[in-house]
Every structure is written in structure tokens, then in C-alpha cells.
Amino acid sequence: MSDVSSPLPAEAGLEDPTRIVGIDLGTSYSALAILDEDGQPRVIDNTSGSPLTASVVLLGSEDRAEVDPEAEILARSRPEQRVVAIKRELGNPRFALRHGNRRLTPELLSSLILTRLRQDAEKQLGSIRRAVITVPYYFNELRRRATRNAGQIAGIDVVDIINEPTAAALTYAWTSGALGQVGPSVSRSILVYDLGGGTFDVTLVEITATHLRVRATDGDTMLGGMDWTDRLTEVVAEEIIDEGGVDPREDPEVSFRLSQACETAKRTLSERMVTTLRLSHDGRDYSVDLTRSRFERVTADLLQRTRDTTELVLAQADVQGAELDEIVLIGGSTAMPGVRTMLEELGGQPPSDLLDPQLAVAQGAAIHAAILESREEGVDGGTGRALRRRLQAISTANVNSHSLGVEVTDRDDTKSRWNHIMIPRNTPVPCQVTQRFVTNTDNPRAIYIRLLEGEVSDVDSCVVIGDFRVVDLPPGLAAGTPIEVQYGYDRSGHIKVAARELVGNTEASV
């Protein structure tokens, strides 16, 4: 797709032009979009003329890397050079690749994809330094923070993080004319089913003429189209073994070719009932016939996982499938016919064909970016007055995807500790909660506050998203001294926590 390679970036300085673009940083493909002067969300083609840029990084020599390499170049590369699905590792502090003398984190590798998107778009739009970037609803705080860091490394000021289903719902509501129009306001319930290459989200959204409100959401950051491909890879590999062949997964080069062939077969089976997969391996030519019914049978458990999640979201919002006004498909993996069939059974209607599943998230990010621009003083963002008024009339309301809490201990048994949830999942944001706790010991030198994200009481099963200490306490504080903790979550997903002991009013925050 592109034969242009770029050096691994040093940390870039930030400019601050008025334009804000929307970016879908995807597991398999990424895209950048704007809202044009006619009010149309438009995805900007890359230098190869495609609206989609593969989220693949090919590591070269001399600290160079290529994003979205040509298929032939990728096929000739060594396995250790290929970086795919890096989005799944964002926020994982234990993951890093060694390339020469450099340690490549998921944030740095993701920044290369963002840099490619920015540089390609700048050839058409001029300087780009601000963006809204989308993430799966079920990304936790560490993953969201890592996404912002990736943008910063790429020289982008990430003015907001928006959840992918919300972005898609914005695109649907905007392009259908249901959002931002003057007239009678009718509330509609929209189910957004987002099955991408590496992540899955399902969200129930309520839309009126001026308001978009998320009612419930759930998902899985480790479930996506690549898992269907992997399952097909296992099936074909076992068939080759049954024919007396050597397991193709044992050779990294052959394993890569098999995976690519299975990806192609998966896509073909979305359009045809039968396909044949061919693979040369260990001096033999193998030919495996695959049918859509067999593919759907061996991946039925994966689809069922998405159905279970969808039913859970409907139950959380107290909505029956038959009460849905529309079902919107997002993500390239929704092209699999089994997805449409399952959702039609669940909702009693076929999913909408209004949106392009692979572009709608980037388009929604661009609409959200334009809404933010419209609220800035002295900035017109290239939009006319009527369009600006339409954008200014829109409000959105999200919910948090994970419960937020603090670690507490038993006063009589300090080894006993648990997660005390202060903001339950699916709470409308922004929100702020204040609760009181007490100290466990006499004359403490500091009060340690540990912030957790998770749905269970077991601390070890939760994610630690931060910690801080309240120090310089008054001397002689008795056990049982009250401590006030204030937990806040803003519209952009920023978490702020403050703690104050109520005798000397000493406080700290993070």
C-alpha cells in the first residue's frame, strides 16, 4: 500500500491550530476523518488512495519502521519484524518489543500508526495537531491513558477520547437526520453492535433531536474477527496433520501464510457458501475445502459470546429486543452473515445498512470533534453559521464502562482487604461521589489511597489505576479518624480523586 517508511519518532512538540480531526485507531485498520463545510463526515484517503490504513507496523533496519506495508513486502518479511494487533496490548506495562537498541512499547508502536494517518492527511488538509481518538467502550483507565500517550508521541494533542459505539451512534444519528435538527423530538433506542478485528463492544443508545445518551454498555477487549481467523487456522492445521503432514503452525513463516490464507477464506465465506484454501508446506501442496456452515459451526461459541453480552446490555437497560428502533453494525467483522442472522433473531428486524461499518467510527469521531470546535470561542472550524448552530445544539451523555473504587481494609484484621466500589459501572458521566471512611491505626504518618477498577470485591482481581498519599497529618490522630474521599469522572473520561482527613483538614489528590 505504501512504500514510504518513517523513522521511529522522537517525542514531538505540539502545535495548536484550530482544526480537530477524528481518528479511529483500530486493531486491524485505522482511519482519519473530518466534518466538511457541507456537514458531511468525510474520511481522508491515505497516500495510497484508500480510506483505511492497515494497523500493521513492519520494523526495518536502522531504527526505521513502515506502517501499512505492501502485501508482497509483508510476506517477504521475517516474523519478528511484523507487529499486528498492537491495540490489544495498549496499557499493558509488561509488553514491549526489542528492535535493535530500542525498547518499543505499545504506545510507541501505536504512535507510528497515528503518525502515518496524520502525515497522509496533512498532504490534503494542512497542519494537524489536535484530534479526537476513539477507543472501545470497555477499555479501562490504563488503556485510555496509553491511547492519549500514543497521540502525544505522534505529535497530536488528544483533546478527547470518545468510545467507538458512541462515535458510530453519532454517525448514524447525524447522517439519518435524527440529530441536530429543529422540530418535534422523538426518542429512539439504537443498539450499536461493534465487532472489530480485535475488540467487541455492544451499546444501547437513546437518541433525540439534540441529545445522545448511552444507557448501557459492555464488551470484550480480547474478542474480535482475528479470533474467528485463528479458529479457522486451527481447523485447517488439524486437517493437514490428519493427512499426515507436519503442523504448519510450527514454522513461523508457514504459520503466517496460513493465517493470511484463513483471513482471505473467512472473508470469502461472507460472500460465498464454499471456498478452497490452498497452502504449500513441507514439500506438499494442500487443498482444504471450507463451507460457510462448517465455519459457522466451529466458531459458534465466539458468536454466542457476543450474543450473551448483547442480551446482558439489553437487560441492564430494561429493554426488550423487539423494542429497539434500529440495530447498527460497526466493524469489518460484522460482514460475517452469522452476525446479521443472530441480531435479526434477537431484535426482530434486520440490522441497518445506512453506515459503512469500517468508516462509521472515524466519521463519528469527526462529528464529535466538530461539536467540540463549535463550542470554542473565536473558532469557526471551517463550518458555516447554520451548521455551527446545529452542532452547538447537540449534547452527549455517556456511562462509565468499569466500576471505580478504593481499596479498604478491615479495622480488626488489616490483612483483610477488598475493593469498595464508589462509582458502579454504567453510571452516567460526568459524576462525582463523596464518601467517608475511617483510619485503622493510631497516629498514622500517612494515609495511603489505592484506586481500583473492577466489578468484584477481590482486590487482586481488579486493576490498580493509581494511588496517592495524604501526608503531613496532625500528630496524635486516633484510629477511627474520619477520612473523606471524593471520586470524580468527567465527560472526557478523566478520573480525579481527592482525600481529606477531617481533623486537621489535610488533603491530597490525584
Language model region names:
Residues 1-89, 99, 103, 122-510:
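Oxyanion-binding/catalytic loops of NTP- or PPi-dependent enzymes
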Residues 107:
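Conserved adenosine/adenylate-binding substructure
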Residues 111-118, 303, 307:
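Short, hydrophobic/amphipathic alpha-helical packing segments
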